C-alpha cells in the first residue's frame, strides 16, 4: 500500500503542475477528457454520471470551464431541458497537449521494464482494482 501512495502522490504532483499551466484542475481535465472521448460533447447528466457527483457540482465545474473558454453549450434537440456541453477548439488543443504529456509520462514510468513486465504489471493492477470493486462479505471482526 505504501508504494501505491508514493507513486500516486508523485503522479498527482506532476499532473497538478501540468494542469495548472493550462488553468485547469484535475476534475476539469477529467471532464475535458470525457468530452473528447465522446466526440467532443455530452449532456451535463452524462458528466454527472461519469464523475459520480451531483448536478450542482457539475454546474460549478462546467461554469468554470465555460468562463475559461474550454466549453460552450447548446440545447439538446431531443430534450430542450438538457444542455449539451461542447468542447471548444482551445479545449481540443489542450487535450492533445495533455495526452502527449501522459504518453511521455507513461514512457518514463515504464522505461526500465520489458514489454512482458508492463503487461504483467497491467494485469496485476487491473486485478487489484477489480478486487477493490467487489462487494466485501460481512465479517464478524
Give the role of each language-model region.
Residues 46-48:
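A short acidic, leucine-rich amphipathic alpha-helix
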Residues 38-43:
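Short capping segments at the starts of secondary-structure elements
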Residues 1-2, 22-33, 56:
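Short alpha-helical elements of helix-turn-helix
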Residues 12, 63-123:
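Charged, amphipathic alpha-helical coiled-coil/dimerization segments
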